[in-house]
């Protein structure tokens, strides 16, 4: 079985991926800002407290890993309407460089429907609301996807539409 690093493993889809990987028999390394709060204990789970924007933390978590699942997210807030973010692109630049340095080739990244070439594939009403409320976040996800696509890694980008937990 593989050793998988999950970045953003403390909640939501990252936590679900962690549980699924353990259930499938994989060894999981979990990097999260609040790793102590990951509500899973398993002999095949190693938790790392660290930030996806910290190159040293990412390199440490990558040691001995066969593949990476990146599930970064931001909590909805009014600031999303007015402020841009670089979380996704900055963290991905750091991750890709560290993966190349450590010789890790496989990356699965979750962005979201509306990123990259899936932008503007909804109805007029959906697209208008989407750009108003999430446009700044998804502009950074566009950059994130380009970084991955140009990385030379063996990658998969998944774009879920709605995540409910």
Predicted regions mapped to residue ranges:
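Conserved Rossmann-fold NAD(P)-dependent oxidoreductase catalytic core, especially the SDR/UDP-sugar
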Residues: 29, 35, 90, 94-136, ...
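Short, polar loop motifs at secondary-structure junctions
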Residues: 31-37, 162-163
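Active-site beta-alpha turn of Rossmann-fold NAD(P)-dependent dehydrogenases/reductases
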Residues: 72, 108-111, 161
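Conserved catalytic-site region of short-chain dehydrogenase/reductase
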Residues: 77, 113-119, 163-165
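Conserved beta-loop-beta element that borders a ligand/cofactor-binding pocket
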Residues: 145-165
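Conserved beta-strand positions in the Rossmann-like core of class I SAM-dependent methyltransferases
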Residues: 5, 29, 156
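NAD(P)H-binding glycine-rich loop region in Rossmannoid oxidoreductase-like domains
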Residues: 36-94, 98-101
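N-terminal Rossmann NAD(P)H-binding glycine-rich loop of SDR-like oxidoreductase domains
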Residues: 4-24
């Amino acid at each position: 079985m593989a050793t998988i690093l999950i970045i953003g493993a403390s909640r939501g889809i990252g936590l679900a991926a962690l549980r699924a990987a353990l259930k499938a028999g994989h060894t999981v390394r979990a990097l999260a800002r609040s790793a102590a709060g990951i509500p899973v204990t398993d002999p095949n789970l190693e938790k790392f407290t660290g930030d996806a924007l910290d190159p040293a933390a990412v390199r440490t978590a990558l040691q001995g890993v066969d593949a990476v699942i990146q599930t970064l997210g931001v909590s909805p807030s009014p600031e999303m309407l007015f402020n841009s973010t670089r979380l996704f692109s900055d963290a991905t630049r750091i991750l890709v460089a560290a993966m190349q340095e450590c010789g890790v080739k496989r990356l699965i990244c979750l962005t979201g429907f509306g990123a990259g070439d899936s932008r503007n594939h909804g109805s007029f009403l959906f697209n208008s609301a989407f750009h108003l409320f999430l446009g700044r976040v998804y502009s950074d996800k566009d950059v994130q996807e380009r970084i991955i696509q140009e990385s030379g890694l063996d990658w998969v980008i998944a774009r879920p539409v709605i995540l409910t937990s």
